[in-house]
Amino acid sequence: MDFAISTEQRGRWQYDEPAPGREHFIEEAFDGYRQQARLLQPDVERAPPLFVVGGARSDFTRLNPLLYRLQRQGIGSLTANLSGHSLASEPGAEGASLAINLDEAQRFVQHLSGRCRTLLGHSLGAAIALKLAAQLPQIDKLVLICPAVYPDAAHTEPFGPAFSAAIRQPWAFLDCDSYAFLRQFNGRVLLVIGEYDGLNSKAHGQGPGTSAGTRVLRGVSRYSPIPEEVTHALLRSVPAPHAECLLLTDCDHGIAAHLRDVPQVADQVADTVAGFVLDSE
């Protein structure tokens, strides 16, 4: 249902900044807690709204530099706060997990009344978006920004030590049915990846099938939590004619911060995503 955001609630957002157009807020009641989502609506709609699944430690304002630009270009979006990731989502579900986040996302996407054709997943949110897409037959486009993929067994583990242990096992990320989903997905996929994310782990002193982690390269600290093999496995799973990839130079896994710090890159990413969404081929 639509509801009015209070000053106290705004104070819990990561970024309280004015939207370039209309915004509406939706609240859903779950088992013992509530979560909110924000719908950005363009003045002139050129495409159905995206459903956006944010990354770890994100609320629905984290991707403002991208989502506001898309709103100006006629593409709206609905983004929900998911349990376990931000001050704005607290208290949230007890024992929050990817599976609980998926349930929350499923509830919120229903507010788009089946109009949504594109899912956008950021980092951890990409793992959830892939699971969500498998349940929504109308989805024909996926935008995956610095995507993470986790073993299926990790999806029910509560965030914390158990979840971390499950995802840090070498090669565990291959134990996921999202690759099989992509192999039969008839739609198109856009990957947006930082140049210094998905670094080769062996080249940086780590074991195969793991991430390179944080590395200092040419005097600059670079964060690469995504194993190189995850990106390769995703690209292998999507038929070549259906896959596009935008590589952001001088950028690591922190794409959300990079878009905020470098407006011209935010322009580039927004233009690429808008072109992808609006392309009817």
What is the predicted role of each segment?
Residues 120-129:
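Gly/Ala-rich beta-loop-alpha elbow adjacent to hydrolase catalytic centers
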Residues 2-42:
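N-terminal cap/lid segment of alpha/beta-hydrolase-fold proteins
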Residues 71-89:
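Conserved alpha/beta-hydrolase
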Residues 56-68, 203-204:
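The serine-hydrolase catalytic nucleophile loop
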Residues 251-263:
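Catalytic histidine-centered segment of alpha/beta-hydrolase-like enzymes
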Residues 94-112:
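Alpha/beta-hydrolase active-site loop
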Residues 47, 53-58:
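Active-site glycine-rich loops that stabilize anionic/oxyanionic intermediates
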Residues 185, 191-193:
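Short beta-strand/loop motif that positions the catalytic acidic residue
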